[in-house]
Amino acid sequence: MATLILKQTLIILLIIFSLQTLSSQARILRSYRAVSMGNMDSQVLLHELGFDLSKFKGHNERRFLVSSDRVSPGGPDPQHH
């Protein structure tokens, strides 16, 4: 009797979890060619995923905090192998 109840419970749980995965909401990225090419800008990607860039706090200000003229380091440290 206990094994029958256990089997029924497991079947019900399996049905509940499978129904939950069927109702999951995932976004489909329509611009798959641009992503596969590797030349997609992050802002374009966020827009394609449905995010409103104007609602991000300070997304334009952060761009000006980073200097665009980066200098490469002087080479490997002679103290390390």
Curated annotation (Swiss-Prot):
Which residues are recorded with the post-translational modification Hydroxyproline?
P73, P76
List the InterPro entries: CLAVATA3-CLE
* KW 4Fe-4S (keyword) present: no
Any idea which UniProt keywords this protein has? Developmental protein, Differentiation, Glycoprotein, Hydroxylation, Secreted, Signal
Q: Report one GO cellular component.
A: apoplast
Name of protein: CLAVATA3/ESR (CLE)-related protein 5
User: What taxonomic ancestry is recorded?
Assistant: Eukaryota, Viridiplantae, Streptophyta, Embryophyta, Tracheophyta
Which BP terms does GO give this entry?
cell-cell signaling involved in cell fate commitment
Q: Which family does it belong to?
A: Belongs to the CLV3/ESR signal peptide family.
Region forming the signal peptide: 1-26
Q: Name one GO molecular function term.
A: receptor serine/threonine kinase binding
Glycosylation: which residues?
Answer: P76
Which gene is annotated as encoding this protein in its UniProt record? CLE5
